[in-house]
Amino acid sequence: MKENEIGLLRGGQIKYLLSRQMNSLCKKYHLRLTDIEVLFYLKNNTEKNTASDIQKNLHINKGYVSQIVKNLIKEDYLTVTAGEKDHRYMHYTITEKTHDITDEHQRIWDLLGRKLFEGISTEDRETFDKVVNTIYENITEMLNEQPDTAHA
């Protein structure tokens, strides 16, 4: 693989850019980027809203998810309810207080997306989307082949 391909796949540059873009949002609301990502995830995944769902979809370890949701509940960004079928499962829902944060987060992502793909033709963008989807499927397949020891 070429160096720039490795860099892109490792995500370092994109993570750094995202961190810089989100820094003012984090400071404004006194939240960490991971806290905001959890709120945004829950806004967009109202049916997949347990700690296990958050852990699996955001690739955050179980203990850290527990700490995050505890703090977000304490700060009135989340509410928690026991599952109807199984009371052991806690379901998290964002509160009204969260909407400004998730709206700003979406605006930042939209701007970032526009800037990242600036100057790229529609045809090249479609090719890129196909390649990214294939890579994503390959990664998912590889992850399913190996036991998860990092998030246990």
How would you describe each model-predicted region?
Residues 20-64:
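N-terminal helix-turn-helix DNA-binding core of bacterial DNA-binding proteins
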Residues 51, 69-70:
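Short, hydrophobic-biased segments on the C-terminal half of alpha helices
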Residues 70-130:
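Charged, amphipathic alpha-helical coiled-coil/dimerization segments
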Residues 14, 34-35, 50, 97, ...:
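N-terminal positioning helix adjacent to the helix-turn-helix/winged-helix DNA-binding module
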Residues 1-29, 75-77:
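N-terminal leader segment of winged-helix/HTH proteins
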Residues 11-21, 58, 101-117, 135-146:
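Alpha-helical linker/hinge and terminal dimerization helices associated
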Residues 1, 122-152:
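C-terminal regulatory/oligomerization modules of transcriptional regulators
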